[in-house]
């Protein structure tokens, strides 16, 4: 079992519809999900990310990504082969991957062939990067997720 991808493992579970997997990731997990999209796994129907990226808060400083140009470049590389529909959700006050950076990432991804809906929600809390951690945020992102998934049924 250890040699199987987690997606394959989960798809084998009786509670999972094996050819209808939706991957969800936040922050670095969202970045991993963007990378995963480039693999086009047959069981993955869609991918949803919240505040996806890597390299934020260098030296503990907000809005200080260690290599934003490389992040954008890598996002474009993933988009070249990705054909899985994606939903990307960010907030205006994300101090790890603010709108300017996340927009460039999205443009790079879709500009090379990737398919991703991009949404920037209004500011949430003191740092919108943690939107997904709060039950109070569900009414903000749940309609986007529902609409996205409804289109894929």
What label would you give each PLM region?
Residues 1-14:
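Alpha/beta-hydrolase active-site loop
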Residues 14, 40, 109:
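Active-site catalytic pocket residues across diverse enzymes, especially alpha/beta-hydrolases
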Residues 15-27:
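Alpha/beta-hydrolase fold nucleophile elbow
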Residues 25-35:
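Glycine-rich nucleophile elbow surrounding the catalytic serine of serine-hydrolase chemistry
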Residues 35, 100-104, 136:
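Generic recognition of short, well-ordered alpha-helical segments
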Residues 36-45:
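Conserved hydrolase catalytic core segment
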Residues 46, 52, 57-112, 117:
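The feature captures the conserved acid-bearing segment of alpha/beta-hydrolase catalytic domains
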Residues 112-153:
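C-terminal catalytic histidine-bearing segment of alpha/beta-hydrolase fold enzymes
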């Amino acid at each position: 079992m250890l040699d199987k991808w987690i997606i394959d493992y989960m798809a084998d579970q009786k509670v999972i519809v094996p050819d209808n997997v939706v991957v969800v990731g936040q922050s670095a997990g969202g970045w991993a999900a963007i990378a995963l999209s480039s693999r086009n796994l047959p069981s993955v129907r869609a991918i949803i990310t919240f505040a996806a990226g890597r390299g934020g808060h260098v030296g503990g400083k907000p809005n200080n990504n260690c290599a934003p140009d490389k992040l954008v470049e890598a996002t474009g590389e993933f988009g070249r082969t990705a054909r899985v529909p994606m939903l990307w959700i960010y907030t205006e006050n994300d101090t790890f991957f603010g709108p300017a950076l996340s927009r460039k990432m999205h443009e790079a991804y879709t500009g090379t062939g990737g398919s991703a809906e991009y949404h920037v929600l209004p500011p949430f809390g003191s740092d919108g990067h943690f939107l997904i951690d709060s039950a109070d945020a569900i009414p903000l992102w749940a309609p986007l997720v529902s609409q996205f998934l409804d289109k894929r049924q």
